[in-house]
Swiss-Prot record:
Belongs to the NPL4 family. Coiled coil: none annotated. The gene is NPL4. This is Nuclear protein localization protein 4. InterPro entries: MPN (IPR037518), Npl4 (IPR016563), NPL4_C (IPR007717), Npl4_Ub-like_dom (IPR024682), NPL4_Zn-bd_put (IPR007716). Keywords: Cytoplasm, Endoplasmic reticulum, Membrane, mRNA transport, Nucleus, Protein transport, Translocation, Transport. It is a peripheral membrane protein.
Amino acid sequence: MLLRLRSKLGIHRVSCEGNDNFGSVIEKWANQLRLNVDPDSVSVSTQPGVSKLMTEIAHQGVESLGLRHGDMVTVEFKVLDTEEKNVSEKEMTNMTVSASTTSVPISSSHNKGSIRGKVKESALDIELEGETGLIPRSRSSLCRHGEKGMCEYCSPLPPWDKGYQDEHSIKHISFHAYLKQLDEVTNKKSSGSSYIPPLSEPNYEINLNCAGGHEPWPKGICSKCQPSAITLQQQSFRMVDHVEFQESELINQFIDSWRTTGMQRFGYLYGYYKRYDNVPLGIKAVVEAIWEPPQHDEQDGLTMDMDQVVKEVEDTDKLAREMGLERIGMIFTDLTDTGLGDGSVYCKRHKDSFFLSSLEVIMAAKHQLRHPNVSKFSETGLFSSRFVTCCISGNLNQEIDIATYQVSIEAEGLVEADLISGSTHPSQAYINETNDKRYVPEIFYTRKNEYNLTVKQNAKPAFPVDYLLVSLTHGFPKETDDDSTTTANTTTVFKTVAGFPWTNRQAMGQSQDYTELKRYVYKACTGNDLAELQAKLSNFHFLLYLHSIEVLNQQEWSLLIRTVTAPTLHEATEPLLNLINSPGWQTFVMILEQSM
């Protein structure tokens, strides 16, 4: 729990446990401020006008004093030596919490916006944070008021309303609905106290720098440095609600690798995040392109040279950012043909087997940890991830289908602390043993027994991996009623998905070379149809290959990016004409003319 200690130096937070002696809390607070406090002068109070000497209550537990998480305690004290441990105001008001990818400054002063002003969130998050997300309701038969009135039967519902979830079959509420629900409980508007970040990431690692006066693990351990027991629960919210593939041809081209070779395939999803109005305050991941890293495909899996993959992924990420895209997820196949000749595949993933294997869950958690979500409502400035995982496999009708998932924040914590590993049973995650480098606490999970009663069960040696899964919905842009074209056709980044070979498919007999380049784009380059040329250029894999041959300089490449990402031909015309008249483009056309 966190206690807020108010003194003449401001308000400071101290982390503690309910059974800690209150004297240790004051000691932590004094060490935090680097003060040489006279212990006989310290008095504390939780109510105005009622104070107690520290010497009287130092031995009592925090909870026994009636203190709860977030409570404010007023501290009065005298300093023995004001010159000892000279603390500047800057040192007292600024602390830095380091995360794996960034450092987020967090102020410990009484300023209510301490964390909020120092973390740069996405425009989407800022937009959703500014909305209430209230669910409107029309008048019902129980209403007894006029048209302009409102009562409990027709007043708007909060975005986390359980009844609305059940009625619309929403298994997980959106992240921002969960955040508003949590923030309402943690920071009540009537209290007027300093702001407490409602989000915190679980930390299941043992503290190797414990101040308890003992040797670090494995030579010593105490209740303060060891992680508490873990009870696994289904996560009630999801960071992303929906995955939208801008073109069905994206999936068709990706599956073609399996159709051609019978081998499995893996790829990364590139796109962006957008609001999703089908759920209150929802977010969807919009997939614009799939990029396949170098891999050696097999019938039951695949292998990769990670050094090569990391280098190529970094280069692809950089080019994608120039196009306004980011790596938002991963996708892989698990397909086995039935041999009936009708295109049917075996259904291997269902409620009686598994949805994601334990190894796949761990892989998803590692990817999510590498792509953290920035949030000013978190203690560290980071909270979970929006990285999604998609699996293409057979459904119950033996048809090829897509399933989309994330793993819970508990899964991220378990993987980061190295507490779980894969097992021979894909539906079970194995709990690692305690060793010199890690301490494994007790892990439990709840389940329904044969009497339909909820019971808590010890998770060792393994537990169902479904407790770590968060399911998402998926689909394609809906067709409009007026012209029967997809709504994505006016907003999609890339106009063409097929036609030019995808990257890293040499083993399938699909190479990217000058011959393929000429076949794909030469006619459009030498013609007079600007719309056709823009559509041909607007191809993710064509752009990656064109960049690799280094025929365009940086200015010409920028013109090309402006051309292919322009939403309309009118906006693309000017940069396209400038590109056509550039020396680099003329050289490119000459290379195509001389190619076989």
